[in-house]
Amino acid sequence: MAEYDHYEDDGFLNSFNDSSQEEHQDFLQFRKVFLPCMYLVVFVCGLVGNSLVLVISIFYHKLQSLTDVFLVNLPLADLVFVCTLPFWTYAGIHEWIFGQVMCKTLLGVYTINFYTSMLILTCITVDRFIVVVKATKAYNQQAKRMTWGKVICLLIWVISLLVSLPQIIYGNVFNLDKLICGYHDEEISTVVLATQMTLGFFLPLLAMIVCYSVIIKTLLHAGGFQKHRSLKIIFLVMAVFLLTQTPFNLVKLIRSTRWEYYAMTSFHYTIIVTEAIAYLRACLNPVLYAFVSLKFRKNFWKLVKDIGCLPYLGVSHQWKSSEDNSKTFSASHNVEATSMFQL
């Protein structure tokens, strides 16, 4: 993203970087190829996956639980997030040509939707904890929880806007050999950066560790058809979050405390690679939080059938069989599926 672009430009970086000119040119060439390619992959996969989740959630799936409310807001945030990537892709290959207003706007949109996504993931984690550990209470208060869920989602968007204000205020277009959209980190206090990292990484991580630990303990003491599948999904969710988000946030933490690392070309490689890996969450969220659901996959095949693609895919018979199996499964495992599916 443009947050780091001006630190990787020739004129700015060479003013304090003691690495050789050749190394720096190699880095710039790598960055010019690597970031646009990664942005394009995330954009295409994120656009398709999150659009599917939104369409199915709105037109094929009734909002029957608090998780359903979150699963409408999560793909919306990720979808808007990935839609900013083509602008950063073009700017990475060429330069920023979209003006100062668009620079501030896209920095704001990018950041708002990033933190909205992470906070919603936190809420989904807590909701899963309540549904599994406090199943009876959660079921009895379903209507009340739905109302609170909508209020919580609204608050999340507002909080994300407030946390993103520094990027919007300090975002600007700089002329450093070429036009760059970004901001000077010196103008953003350590307190603000710490707040952003807390909401964007440490809070979701803490929620996952605490809630999933209790959920795992509960599942291990319970029997049932889906116990092992639910445990696998939990470990997968945790592993994906840690592998994609930890490296980039660790780099951001180092960046905020040890500025001398900017003198190392290798540190800049680390920044752009870990950043690209962190963005993969926008592609993986639809799989981890939607397509693992049997009901969601069933609605997906309904969508495919409605748009007339089913005969061309040659899966009409399989879809019919899957639908019958879904009905059988729902009839025999209704209570269990209600609580476990959301894992």
From Swiss-Prot:
GO biological process: calcium-mediated signaling; cell chemotaxis; immune response; inflammatory response; positive regulation of cytosolic calcium ion concentration
GO molecular function, one term: C-C chemokine receptor activity
UniProt-annotated glycosylation sites, renumbered to this chain: 17
Residue ranges that the UniProt entry lists as topological domain Extracellular: 1-33, 91-104, 166-188, 261-276
Statement: the UniProt record of this protein carries the keyword Hydrolase: no
A GO CC term assigned to this protein in UniProt: external side of plasma membrane
Location in the cell: Cell membrane
InterPro entries recorded: CCR1-9-like (IPR050119), Chemokine_CXCR6 (IPR002235), Chemokine_rcpt (IPR000355), GPCR_Rhodpsn (IPR000276), GPCR_Rhodpsn_7TM (IPR017452)
Chief location bin: membrane
Keyword vocabulary terms for this entry: Cell membrane, Disulfide bond, G-protein coupled receptor, Glycoprotein, Membrane, Receptor, Transducer, Transmembrane, Transmembrane helix
Membrane protein topology class: Multi-pass membrane protein
Transmembrane segments: 34-60, 70-90, 105-126, 145-165, 189-216, 233-260, 277-294
Keyword Glycoprotein: yes
Disulfide partners: 103-181
Stretches assigned to the Cytoplasmic side: 61-69, 127-144, 217-232, 295-343
Pfam assignment, any one: 7tm_1
Alphabetical list of PANTHER family matching this protein: C-X-C CHEMOKINE RECEPTOR TYPE 6, CELL ADHESION MOLECULE
Similarity-based family: Belongs to the G-protein coupled receptor 1 family.
UniProt function note: Receptor for the C-X-C chemokine CXCL16. Used as a coreceptor by SIVs and by strains of HIV-2 and m-tropic HIV-1.
Protein name: C-X-C chemokine receptor type 6
Source taxonomy: Eukaryota, Metazoa, Chordata, Craniata, Vertebrata
